[in-house]
């Protein structure tokens, strides 16, 4: 033995375990222990045997005399060979024979779970299930049978014969039914075979030829009754018994790949998943058959061009499969091969000199038979239809069923059951009469059908379970859709609730700010919770350019941004030159207040020259902005409440006009809304443009704009005031007072009400332009007196 490494001796390589060249303790000895008390080793390995087999690399011998160790991954051979540590103390085995214990039976076979399928029972107490099933009678007597049996026994007693028990009659009825069923099936098969095999017009389903020769006989399928030649269908050897075609062997009825017909002599493709008629494969030029001897499989279907697949048959008018065309030159009428056979078109098979077969097909126009052409009799052009064949077959079957009793031999039944012939004849006549009364139907189902019914529930259960799983999956899909819709609806509801919560928190915050500022609460929390907040439309109009006749160029309207006279929250006259507020459009809530008879808050005049506090209904306007525009505090609230009872009388008419005692501030008198309900036409002309003060923070930003716009606004308002005050006062305003430059806001044009055209029709506007604040204040005072007088006059 030779290794691929440096030469080593046994001393250098045997250093991992004790060697046999010296006697030593494997585990060593404790200090102080005498040498005679040393323990013997438990295991002994000899490495000298391995070392003796090693050869140094310098040893020159032939390669055939040693083995080369090339695997150095796990060197187990370095450990040596284990030998006996104490060969003198080998234990000797001692053996003795003991008596065999009896076996305990731990399992007992229950008889009801054990079935014996053999013919003869092997153990006592066991029975054969098949024998029991065969011994059981399948026919059960009904009430009519029992009554007839009693009458028969009475007659037999009078005749001196023995009585017939119920079991004997049941066995006789079963034997008659079984023999009738077997003989009728054989007769039906024989009749069908005779009707096909001995038919003179029967032809091969492939070549359409009625002739046969020795070695190429015509074979009939025992299930579908097709007739083919041996060579046409590839039958190498005709079987002795029944013969079935390929489709009947598999029990399928596939559709042809090349035509729309089903049934007939068909063969499968190479994959075995698609089928085609052998005749279609022969007549279509692109398709071929791989093995001509067996005429299968059908190949090269993919070589059919798309133009052939797109042809429409001229006979069946279908675009299914591949069509062939007429062989006449310049005639391209397409038709299926099977359709041509059904319509008896001329289909020729020509054998050339080079043993090549050519197929010639002709359309309906070119396949007219010539005079004296053999093989084309009128009967061949009008073959019996499938309906005629089925009706003839049904007629034969009906004749067989009507003569069912002729297929029963009572002598054989009496011999098999060991019964007297005259006794069995009674039962036979009764059986015939009972079956006749049942429209010649069998009294027992065939035994084969019962065996199939035993397997049918299992198949039905599989289909039922598959159908159940399909419906279950559909139901689960519906549940999934419903769950998705419910979750989506709940998410939308959650988002809506969060939005309502945010709106409520904002309203609470604004109410708290209003209460802390000392302002009256404009709306209740309940209205905010149960009613949607009104739509806020903020309309800021700049003064319009006046026309030459002194009228405004803009027209009043009823749009969403144009306030209506019946929907004004409150109406005030000008509080000063260029002072005003934006209009808030809230028609729907104002109409509801008018219908419910709620009085709008009156506008009171403060004597200290400040802006009069306004009691505002729910307008949808942010209260913080409302407070900022007013710039008011809660110190003027008590004075206004004290004067409220004096302004409004029970009949809805002001007691007296409210006069202005301080010329630095003007307040407009507001007409009672109850007077508006009683007379809308009277109140429509007395609405003035509602104006409010802006906060002081807006004064400096708008002072330059107000200087130019106050003059136009003052002229318009002065003409309105002079028009109302003409019937009662002829006093002309005089110059004096402060200039209009002290205005602290701008004034929108006065045309913010739908009632202005009506007011213009009643009152003619006039007067001179007043440029000073004092004159404007006097004019406004006269206007207020005019309102009061006009109201009283019109009432």
From Swiss-Prot:
<feature type="zinc finger region" description="C2HC pre-PHD-type">
    <location>
        <begin position="253"/>
        <end position="287"/>
    </location>
</feature>
<feature type="region of interest" description="Disordered">
    <location>
        <begin position="667"/>
        <end position="687"/>
    </location>
</feature>
<dbReference type="InterPro" id="IPR001965">
    <property type="entry name" value="Znf_PHD"/>
</dbReference>
<dbReference type="InterPro" id="IPR019542">
    <property type="entry name" value="Enhancer_polycomb-like_N"/>
</dbReference>
<keyword id="KW-0479">Metal-binding</keyword>
<dbReference type="GO" id="GO:0000123">
    <property type="term" value="C:histone acetyltransferase complex"/>
</dbReference>
<feature type="compositionally biased region" description="Polar residues">
    <location>
        <begin position="720"/>
        <end position="732"/>
    </location>
</feature>
<keyword id="KW-0863">Zinc-finger</keyword>
<protein>
    <recommendedName>
        <fullName>Protein Jade-3</fullName>
    </recommendedName>
</protein>
<dbReference type="InterPro" id="IPR050701">
    <property type="entry name" value="Histone_Mod_Regulator"/>
</dbReference>
<feature type="compositionally biased region" description="Low complexity">
    <location>
        <begin position="1"/>
        <end position="25"/>
    </location>
</feature>
<dbReference type="InterPro" id="IPR019786">
    <property type="entry name" value="Zinc_finger_PHD-type_CS"/>
</dbReference>
<dbReference type="InterPro" id="IPR039550">
    <property type="entry name" value="JADE3_PHD"/>
</dbReference>
<feature type="region of interest" description="Disordered">
    <location>
        <begin position="714"/>
        <end position="795"/>
    </location>
</feature>
<dbReference type="InterPro" id="IPR011011">
    <property type="entry name" value="Znf_FYVE_PHD"/>
</dbReference>
<comment type="function">
    <text>Scaffold subunit of some HBO1 complexes, which have a histone H4 acetyltransferase activity.</text>
</comment>
<dbReference type="InterPro" id="IPR013083">
    <property type="entry name" value="Znf_RING/FYVE/PHD"/>
</dbReference>
<dbReference type="GO" id="GO:0008270">
    <property type="term" value="F:zinc ion binding"/>
</dbReference>
<comment type="subunit">
    <text>Component of the HBO1 complex.</text>
</comment>
<dbReference type="InterPro" id="IPR019787">
    <property type="entry name" value="Znf_PHD-finger"/>
</dbReference>
<keyword id="KW-0677">Repeat</keyword>
<dbReference type="Pfam" id="PF10513">
    <property type="entry name" value="EPL1"/>
</dbReference>
<comment type="similarity">
    <text>Belongs to the JADE family.</text>
</comment>
<keyword id="KW-0862">Zinc</keyword>
<feature type="region of interest" description="Disordered">
    <location>
        <begin position="630"/>
        <end position="654"/>
    </location>
</feature>
<feature type="zinc finger region" description="PHD-type 2">
    <location>
        <begin position="311"/>
        <end position="367"/>
    </location>
</feature>
<dbReference type="GO" id="GO:0006357">
    <property type="term" value="P:regulation of transcription by RNA polymerase II"/>
</dbReference>
<dbReference type="InterPro" id="IPR034732">
    <property type="entry name" value="EPHD"/>
</dbReference>
<dbReference type="Pfam" id="PF13832">
    <property type="entry name" value="zf-HC5HC2H_2"/>
</dbReference>
<feature type="compositionally biased region" description="Polar residues">
    <location>
        <begin position="678"/>
        <end position="687"/>
    </location>
</feature>
<feature type="region of interest" description="Disordered">
    <location>
        <begin position="1"/>
        <end position="41"/>
    </location>
</feature>
<feature type="zinc finger region" description="PHD-type 1">
    <location>
        <begin position="201"/>
        <end position="251"/>
    </location>
</feature>
<dbReference type="Pfam" id="PF13831">
    <property type="entry name" value="PHD_2"/>
</dbReference>
């Amino acid at each position: 033995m030779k290794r691929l490494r440096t030469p080593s001796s046994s001393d250098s390589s045997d250093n991992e375990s004790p060697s046999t060249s010296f006697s030593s303790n494997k585990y060593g000895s404790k200090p102080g222990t005498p040498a005679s008390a040393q323990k013997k080793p438990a295991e002994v390995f000899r490495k000298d045997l391995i070392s003796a087999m090693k050869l140094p690399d310098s040893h020159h011998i032939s390669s055939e005399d040693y083995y080369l160790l090339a695997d150095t991954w796990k060197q187990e051979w370095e450990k040596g060979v284990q030998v006996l540590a104490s060969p003198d103390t080998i234990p000797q085995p001692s053996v003795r024979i003991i008596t065999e214990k009896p076996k305990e039976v731990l399992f007992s076979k229950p008889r009801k779970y054990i079935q014996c399928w053999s013919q003869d029972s092997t153990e006592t107490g066991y029975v054969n299930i098949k024998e029991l099933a065969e011994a059981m009678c399948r026919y059960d007597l009904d009430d009519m049978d029992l009554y007839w049996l009693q009458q028969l026994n009475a007659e037999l007693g009078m005749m001196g014969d023995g009585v017939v028990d119920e079991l004997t009659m049941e066995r006789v009825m079963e034997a008659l039914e079984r023999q009738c069923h077997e003989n009728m099936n054989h007769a039906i098969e024989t009749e069908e075979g005779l009707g096909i095999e001995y038919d003179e017009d029967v032809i091969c389903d492939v070549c359409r030829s009625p002739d046969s020769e020795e070695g190429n006989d015509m074979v009939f399928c025992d299930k579908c009754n097709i007739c083919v030649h041996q060579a046409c269908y590839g039958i190498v050897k005709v079987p002795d018994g029944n013969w079935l075609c390929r489709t009947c062997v598999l029990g399928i009825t596939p559709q042809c790949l090349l035509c729309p017909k089903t049934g007939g002599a068909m063969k499968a493709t190479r994959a075995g998943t698609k089928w085609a008629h052998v005749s279609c494969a022969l007549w279509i030029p692109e398709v071929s058959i791989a093995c001509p001897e067996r005429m299968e499989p059908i190949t090269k279907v993919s070589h059919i061009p798309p133009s052939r697949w797109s042809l429409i048959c001229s006979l069946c008018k279908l675009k299914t499969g591949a069509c062939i065309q007429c062989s006449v030159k310049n005639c391209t009428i397409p038709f299926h091969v099977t359709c041509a056979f059904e319509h008896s078109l001329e289909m020729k098979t020509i054998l050339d000199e080079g043993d090549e077969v050519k197929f010639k097909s002709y359309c309906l126009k070119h396949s007219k038979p010539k005079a004296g052409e053999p093989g084309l009799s009128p009967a061949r052009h009008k073959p019996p239809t499938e309906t005629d064949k089925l009706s003839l077959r049904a007629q034969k079957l009906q004749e067989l069923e009507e003569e069912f009793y002729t297929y029963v031999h009572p002598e054989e039944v009496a011999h098999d059951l060991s019964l007297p012939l005259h006794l069995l004849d009674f039962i036979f006549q009764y059986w015939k009469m009972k079956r006749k009364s049942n429209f010649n139907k069998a009294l027992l189902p065939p035994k084969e059908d019962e065996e199939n019914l035993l397997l049918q529930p299992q198949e039905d259960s599989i289909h039922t379970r598959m159908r159940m799983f399909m419906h279950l999956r559909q139901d689960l899909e519906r549940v999934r859709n419903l769950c998705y819709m419910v979750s989506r609806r709940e998410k939308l509801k959650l988002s809506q609730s969060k939005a309502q919560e945010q709106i409520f928190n904002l309203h609470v915050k604004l109410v708290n700010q209003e209460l802390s500022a000392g302002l009256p609460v404009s709306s209740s929390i309940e209205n905010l919770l149960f009613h949607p907040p009104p739509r806020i439309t903020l309309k800021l109009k700049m003064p319009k350019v006046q026309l030459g006749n002194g009228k405004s160029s803009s027209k009043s309207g009823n749009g969403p941004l144009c306030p209506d006279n019946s929907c004004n929250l409150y109406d005030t006259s000008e509080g000063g030159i260029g002072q005003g507020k934006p209009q808030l459009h809230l028609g729907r809530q104002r109409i509801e207040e008018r219908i419910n008879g709620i009085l709008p808050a009156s506008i009171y005049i403060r004597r200290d020259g400040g802006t009069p506090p306004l009691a505002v209904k729910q307008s949808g306007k942010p209260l913080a902005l409302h407070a900022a525009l007013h710039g008011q505090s809660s110190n003027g609230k008590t004075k206004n409440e004290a004067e409220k009872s004096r302004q409004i009388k029970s009949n809805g008419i002001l007691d007296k006009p409210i006069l202005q005692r301080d010329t630095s501030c003007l307040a407009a008198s507001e007409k009672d809304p109850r007077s508006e309900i009683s007379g809308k036409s009277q109140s429509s002309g007395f609405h003035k443009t509602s104006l409010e003060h802006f906060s002081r923070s807006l004064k400096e930003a708008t002072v330059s704009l107000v200087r130019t716009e106050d003059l136009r606004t003052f002229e318009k308002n002065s003409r309105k005031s002079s028009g109302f005050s003409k019937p009662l006062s002829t006093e002309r305003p005089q110059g004096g007072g402060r200039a209009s430059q002290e205005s602290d806001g701008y004034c929108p044009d006065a045309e913010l009400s739908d009632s202005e055209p009506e007011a213009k029709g009643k009152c003619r506007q006039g007067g001179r332009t007043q440029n000073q604040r004092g004159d404007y204040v006097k004019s406004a005072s006269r206007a207020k007196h005019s309102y009061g007088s006009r109201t009283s006059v019109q009432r």
